[in-house]
Amino acid sequence: MKVHMLKSKIHNAIVTSGDLEYEGSITIDKELLEIADMMANEKVLVVNNNNGERFETYIIEGTRGLREIQLNGAAARCALPGDEIIIMAFAEMEPEEARNWQPMIVIVDRMNNPKRRHRVGKDNEYLG
């Protein structure tokens, strides 16, 4: 039996734009994806801290350095530009591996610049 564990989280990201006409997804700056150990097409759970909305979508890789967090398609109705969100990716693993698993947490500022990251239970690595 496998369990679903938090793999990575981008905490307190700010939605920069939305595109209702796009087919769906969330566009995330490539650098943030690398720092958070996330990748294009990966399924994510997004939580809107402003209204409590929770939704699943998949990642599209954005341009490095633009600090873009864009919601596309129906997801654009779940959060507005300026809303604070949490983006979480999960992984399946055996219970033995899960017991020692430490997810990657990335904290960003109000401009989506990465400020620090750490694995749960480990020291912070300050960025920028």
Curated annotation (Swiss-Prot):
Q: Where in the cell is it found?
A: Cytoplasm
Q: Which Pfam families match?
A: Asp_decarbox
Name the GO cellular-component terms: cytosol
Asked if Cytoplasm is a keyword of the record, the answer is yes
Coiled-coil annotation reads none
Look up keyword Oxidoreductase and say if it applies: no
* This enzyme's EC code(s): 4.1.1.11
What are the protein's GO molecular function terms?
aspartate 1-decarboxylase activity
Give the first-level EC class, as a single word.
Answer: lyase
Keywords, A to Z, come to: Autocatalytic cleavage, Cytoplasm, Decarboxylase, Lyase, Pantothenate biosynthesis, Pyruvate, Schiff base, Zymogen
Complexes and interactors? Heterooctamer of four alpha and four beta subunits.
Q: What is this protein called?
A: Aspartate 1-decarboxylase
Which species?
Answer: Chlorobaculum parvum (strain DSM 263 / NCIMB 8327) (Chlorobium vibrioforme subsp. thiosulfatophilum)
